Amino acid sequence: MKQDIHPKYTKVTVTCANCGKDFETRSTRSSIKVDICSNCHPFYTGKQVLVDTAGRVERFKKRFAKATSQSK
């Protein structure tokens, strides 16, 4: 194999945006932030959690309404 062509593979901290839990893994990235981890995921906890997607849906509807009004 050729020398010095592969990216650096180091220890990084993965941080959950939902619960704040941190854990270490190895990656070529400097840090990783995830939306949901196994500590707070509904499958592992047995609790149902509603993820706020209303903002995305409303934004899509607004863009779609604007696009359909312009095409008429």
UniProtKB/Swiss-Prot annotation:
Q: Which domain of life is it from?
A: Bacteria
What GO MF annotations does this protein's record show? rRNA binding; structural constituent of ribosome
GO BP terms: namely: translation
Q: Has the keyword RNA-binding been applied to this entry?
A: yes
**Could you tell me which Pfam families the record lists for this protein?**
Ribosomal_L31 (PF01197)
Q: Give the record's GO CC terms.
A: ribonucleoprotein complex; ribosome
> What are the alphabetically sorted keywords of the record?
Ribonucleoprotein, Ribosomal protein, RNA-binding, rRNA-binding
Function of the molecule = Binds the 23S rRNA.
Q: Which family does it belong to?
A: Belongs to the bacterial ribosomal protein bL31 family. Type A subfamily.
Which HAMAP family does this chain map to? Answer: Ribosomal_bL31_1
What quaternary structure, including any partners, is listed in this protein's UniProt entry?
A: Part of the 50S ribosomal subunit.
* Name of the protein this chain belongs to: Large ribosomal subunit protein bL31
Name its species: Prosthecochloris aestuarii (strain DSM 271 / SK 413)
Lineage here is: Bacteria, Pseudomonadati, Chlorobiota, Chlorobiia, Chlorobiales
